[in-house]
């Protein structure tokens, strides 16, 4: 019986995942929720300062086998930005990081007397040479660096696990399929020099079936990075060319794609660049074509030629088609009905819809924290399996309410602080809040809900949510423009009573995590216009009473009033900020955005006029 901490630290989405096998307890949180810098990849020390219990562990597990020396560059630049500029949110952080990347001399000169600067100078000078000629040395030195860093923090030896295996383990052991034989598919940008893997899991045994390599295309002297073949990276590159933030705004590319049509010539280039080897079950690459496709000037010309919407539609359609083609080949080989999935690309809900509709798999599971936010969970699980621990109980934890919670007393203490007295009013309404909230939504109000444990993963599922009426066609534009302050074309997702699923949607299944889209029946398009995208799809959370009793009551009351057990549900945060964690976060974001009321652990909060 042991306590294990999975730790993701480096590049983006750092965080921890705690498993206590004796008490059957888990806890997961990302660094971004503490620092409020979205996709924060820095040290997990801010988490440990907030939750010191996480230091009381037996083992530490890390979700990479190969962490190269770039870790040193990232760590010190990240520390420097946070120490020097103290950025509040991701926009400020990204601004300073861009400045430093364009002026490395400034960074070096400002830190010349600090002991770590000699590490920086050594890596800057040797990274290209080491990487090209002595890649193994570059990776081994990186592994030593990350182990040294984590051992300094936790005073424990660190176990390293292959990145895609960590994705796969999280998807299988939290799925309802355990202990049955299951195919597990992962797809992301890069992890341990792969971007895709296919596994066979059965109980505590697993084997790697195939993987696709991150084949090096070229070295970018301007950005100081190696570019490689990767389905996730090419999608992120299209996202960047569209003017969005790569590794963050891919959902915007996906949303914009619904307004365009794929360009045949560009689509065919992508198809020729990434070819499926049917025997080896992997993607292989035409490097000459990929050199073109990874040239930003070349892609910029394509975008200008065909327009933003068609540019987005091309990469989206190609993604859907190539993944569906691959998985159909996999199914024909194995004839296994169960498919579990994880990896950053698996956040693409329209791709997942295509897998559901266009492949023969009968059972599909997508891990709620499908991106690198979830690999800490996979690493902790793999350590438990290695130690022979029973983790069969994980599959019973359907809803990812695995983060911190704050009591009514904590909330009351925060509400009473002097800094809020001129900004908000509040009253305690107790357990009747779900019904009052439903009544307010039905009258056209936009409300926020803060209750219970915070969600683990990118989706708010009723505990840190902003809710609104899907019947009003103006709801989406209102939230986009005055509440979330996002682009006009981004859709919002609905939370739906499970008993309403077959009434409102075409072919679907009991999915609870907003990780796949389904098609709304056409007779409801004009009745629930803000619950779906322009193409008639919606990314729903189907809610049962056992999942979240208070949220279920809210939906039931809304159906009683309106005839529809469905509300718009978007995460409780402003655009560019992270989902709120503490009562202080909740009050701050409530004041800063145009929400009519907030329900927080039995309190009804409103802004002073």
Curated annotation (Swiss-Prot):
Q: Which domain of life is it from?
A: Archaea
Which InterPro entries does the UniProt record give?
A: ATPase_NBD (IPR043129), Carbam_trans_C (IPR031730), Carbam_trans_C_sf (IPR038152), Carbtransf_dom (IPR003696), NodU/CmcH_Carbamoyltrnsfr (IPR051338)
Q: From its record, what is one biological process in GO terms?
A: biosynthetic process
In alphabetical order, the GO MF annotations are: transferase activity
Q: Which residues cross the membrane?
A: none
Which cysteines are cross-linked by disulfides? none
Question: What keywords does the record list, in alphabetical order?
Answer: Transferase
Family, according to the entry, reads as follows:
Belongs to the NodU/CmcH family.
What protein does this entry describe? Uncharacterized protein MJ1058
Organism annotation: Methanocaldococcus jannaschii (strain ATCC 43067 / DSM 2661 / JAL-1 / JCM 10045 / NBRC 100440) (Methanococcus jannaschii)
């Amino acid at each position: 019986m042991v306590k294990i901490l999975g730790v993701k630290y480096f590049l983006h989405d750092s965080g921890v995942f705690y498993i206590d096998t004796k008490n059957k307890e888990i806890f997961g949180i990302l660094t971004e929720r503490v620092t409020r810098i979205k996709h924060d990849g820095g040290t997990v020390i801010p988490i440990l300062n907030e939750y010191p219990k996480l230091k009381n562990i037996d083992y530490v597990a890390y979700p990479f086998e190969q962490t190269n020396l770039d870790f040193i560059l990232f760590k010190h630049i990240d520390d420097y930005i946070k120490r020097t500029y103290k950025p509040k949110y991701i926009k400020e952080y990204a601004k300073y990081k861009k400045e430093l990347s364009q002026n490395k001399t400034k960074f070096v000169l400002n830190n010349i007397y600090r002991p770590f600067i000699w590490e920086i100078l050594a890596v800057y000078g040797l990274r290209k040479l080491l990487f090209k000629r002595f890649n193994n040395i570059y990776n081994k030195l990186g592994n030593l660096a990350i182990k040294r860093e984590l051992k300094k923090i936790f005073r424990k030896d660190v176990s390293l696990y292959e990145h895609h295996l960590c994705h796969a383990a999280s998807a299988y052991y939290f799925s309802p399929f355990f202990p049955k034989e299951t195919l597990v598919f992962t797809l992301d940008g890069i992890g341990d020099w792969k971007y895709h893997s296919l596994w066979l899991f059965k109980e505590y045994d697993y084997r790697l079936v195939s993987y696709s390599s991150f084949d090096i295309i070229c070295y970018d002297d301007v950005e100081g990075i190696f570019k490689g073949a990767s389905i996730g990276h090419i999608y992120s590159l299209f996202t960047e060319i569209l003017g969005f933030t790569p590794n963050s705004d891919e959902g915007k590319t996906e949303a914009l794609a619904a307004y365009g049509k794929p360009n045949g010539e560009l689509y065919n280039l992508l198809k020729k660049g990434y070819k499926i080897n049917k025997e080896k079950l992997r993607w292989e690459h035409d490097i000459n074509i990929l050199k073109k496709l990874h040239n930003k000037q070349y892609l910029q010309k394509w975008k200008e030629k065909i327009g933003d919407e068609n540019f987005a539609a091309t990469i989206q359609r190609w993604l859907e088609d190539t993944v569906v083609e691959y998985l159909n080949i996999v199914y024909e080989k194995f004839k296994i009905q169960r498919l579990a999935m994880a990896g950053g690309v698996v956040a693409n809900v329209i791709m997942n819809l295509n897998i559901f509709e266009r492949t023969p798999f009968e059972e599909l599971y997508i891990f709620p924290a499908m991106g690198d936010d979830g690999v800490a969970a996979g690493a902790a699980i793999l350590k438990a399996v290695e130690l022979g621990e029973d983790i069969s109980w994980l599959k019973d934890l359907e809803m990812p309410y695995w983060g911190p919670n704050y009591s009514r007393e904590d909330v009351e203490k925060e509400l009473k602080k002097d800094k809020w007295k001129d900004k908000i009013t509040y009253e305690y309404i107790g357990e009747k809040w779900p019904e009052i909230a439903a009544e307010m939504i039905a009258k056209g109000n936009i409300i926020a809900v803060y209750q219970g444990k915070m969600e683990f993963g990118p989706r708010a599922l009723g505990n840190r949510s902003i809710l609104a009426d899907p019947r009003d066609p103006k709801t989406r534009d209102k939230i986009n423009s005055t509440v979330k302050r996002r682009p006009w074309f981004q859709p919002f997702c609905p939370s739906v009573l499970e008993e309403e699923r077959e009434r409102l949607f075409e072919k679907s299944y009991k999915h609870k995590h907003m990780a796949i889209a389904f098609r709304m029946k056409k007779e409801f398009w004009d009745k629930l216009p803000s619950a779906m995208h322009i193409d008639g799809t919606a990314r729903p959370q189907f809610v049962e009473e056992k999942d979240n009793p208070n949220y279920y009551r809210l939906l039931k009351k809304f159906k009683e009033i309106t005839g529809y057990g469905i509300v718009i549900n978007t995460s409780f945060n402003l655009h560019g900020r992270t989902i709120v964690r503490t009562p202080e976060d909740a009050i701050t974001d409530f004041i800063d955005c145009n929400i009519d009321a907030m329900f927080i652990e039995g309190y009804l909060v409103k802004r002073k006029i």
